[in-house]
Amino acid sequence: MLSNTGNFLLLLSILFTFFIIYQSFTCLKKNNDVIFKSIYKISLLQSTTILICFFTLVGAFMVSDFSLINVYQNSHTLKPIFYKISGTWGNHEGSLLLWVIILTIFSFLFLITNKNHPKNYRINTLIIQNILILGFLFFILFNSNPFSSISLFPKKGLD
């Protein structure tokens, strides 16, 4: 169940990132304030979706959901809860997801805090940031998915 939720949230965040890039290019061409305000809302949704995705992975580590390959390889039932939580980002897949969280939060904070800069500067910066975010999201989804599941899993974990 957590693998489906995590994968759905990853796909949803990819959709939001595409939408932000598309709206940013449209805003550059049309110079429309309504489109620019919608970018704020979609950027907030993008950040929230990635955060929920990460906390889904944290939850999988906390309850020792060994149907996820990532949890199976990096956790054990006897580990203290602190080590289970830190095991979320202590591996390749989790650290990439944490990196995407940092990128999306800084992208959203850039939109909020830099209102005194020219609009074209903000939009161009947002386009570059979201192209990077999109690249990381595709890499996570297709190459280093923390929500990859296995059908036969042990009861105690590897680590």
Where are the language model's segments positioned?
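Polytopic transmembrane helical bundles with strong interfacial aromatic enrichment
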Residues: M1-D159
